[in-house]
Amino acid sequence: MSFYRSWIGGTGDLVKKYTSSIKDDVELAEEVVRVMKGHVAHLVEIGSIPKEAGERIIKALEEVDASELLKEEFEDVHEALEKWLIDKLGEEIGGWVGLGRSRNDHVAAAIRLAALRKTERLKEEACRLRCALAKRALEYADCPMPSFTHFQPAQVITFGHYLLAIDELLAEFLHILRGVEDLLNRSPLGAGPAGGVRTPLDRRRLAELVGFKEVVENALYASGSRFFALALASAVVSFLAELSRAVDDFIRWNSPVVGYVNSPDSHVSTSSIMPHKRNLVTLEVLRARIAEALGHFAAMSALVMKVGMGYSLDLQEATRHLWAVLNIATEGMAVFRDFIENMAFNCEKSRKDAEAYFTTSSDTAEDEALKGVPFRKAYFQLASAIKAGTARLLTINEALKRPVYGSANTEEVKRAASRRLALCRPKPL
């Protein structure tokens, strides 16, 4: 029987399993223990519990194996931890841990801390991917290829330039994550169930003991809001949606019909009946899981938006969707990085296509305009010449000598990739 529920009556296994979050709490069990240690230490500091009792509780918390708390008989890991302490130390000692706290503020704190830990891992993976992209961008700085708009051959670029576009996405993602971290790194402890507690906690000192930088001021918002979780999931899902576009490109380019990408053997599978197939299954799964991440974010939003400002168990259900989004992103970036590090790009084929599909036409028209011909006139003259088969276009090497910052100019790509690589040694970014 669950510890708290025993005071109002028992329940059957069906209901107990249905409402318990214990399986999902594996994601934050260590943070729950960390929060409890800080809470008890502060209770001792302010003299609200006997010093000896507090010291014994903290010693026990240092010994507990968080994984041992994850038993189905409990509603959640918070209940399991309190019961474990009382069983180990007796009610006269362990019973003090309920003072000045609610599961509402403690679970919010644990989620924030676990999210910070997972965000740090996410940032590390993003930095590793950036370094892999920069290395390959330098390698392919002078490898021409068509860019595609409307999935039609457009302006000539290089594969190195393409890879640096993904790198810039990651740079912006990391910038957003740093802002979200500031939101996460605020303590709800001391907020109690909704309006604070009678115990004279110093909420800023308590935040410091647990490892938070700031405090969420309003107690109702501190315990009941999940805006921080939505903000993090939104940032991650927005990044994944954009990354999926590159994933889709590589899947298309892996087809021998296009023939741009030679995928590593470890990333491909074949057909059960067509032995010639080389299906890029890792990126297909990544593309699918990105779609799942969007679904998890939609579920989070739907769960939160119909709940009043105070805590409801609906918010418990929202948390597992946050973990799913973060895990999909972290694992997916690792897989994508391995692909980038080990794939090969067919520069001969991509150059051939760039030459065949008039990908220097815009540069040719611009050149004519810069020589004194009104651009639209030069544009229509070139269009007529292309249609007639008489166009004299700039070569790829000539077209790529664009002088603007951030262009596909080979030297510009090399400089940008080299700057990025310099940040990767010896420690990524």
UniProtKB/Swiss-Prot annotation:
GO MF, any single term: argininosuccinate lyase activity
UniProt enzyme class: lyase
Location in or out of the cell: Cytoplasm
Pathway(s) served: Amino-acid biosynthesis; L-arginine biosynthesis; L-arginine from L-ornithine and carbamoyl phosphate: step 3/3
Reactions catalysed: 2-(N(omega)-L-arginino)succinate = fumarate + L-arginine
Primary location group: cytoplasm
Keywords annotated in UniProt: Amino-acid biosynthesis, Arginine biosynthesis, Cytoplasm, Lyase
Database matches in Gene3D superfamilies: Fumarase/aspartase (C-terminal domain), Fumarase/aspartase (Central domain), Fumarase/aspartase (N-terminal domain)
Ranges in a coiled coil: none
Domain of life where this protein originates: Archaea
InterPro entries in alphabetical order: Argininosuccinate_lyase, Fumarase/histidase_N, Fumarate_lyase_fam, Fumarate_lyase_N, L-Aspartase-like
Catalytic activity, EC: 4.3.2.1
UniProt GO cellular component terms: cytosol
Biological-process GO terms, alphabetical: arginine biosynthetic process via ornithine; L-arginine biosynthetic process
SUPFAM superfamilies: L-aspartase-like
Similarity annotation: Belongs to the lyase 1 family. Argininosuccinate lyase subfamily.
Protein name: Argininosuccinate lyase
Natural source organism: Pyrobaculum aerophilum (strain ATCC 51768 / DSM 7523 / JCM 9630 / CIP 104966 / NBRC 100827 / IM2)
Top-level taxonomy: Archaea, Thermoproteota, Thermoprotei, Thermoproteales, Thermoproteaceae
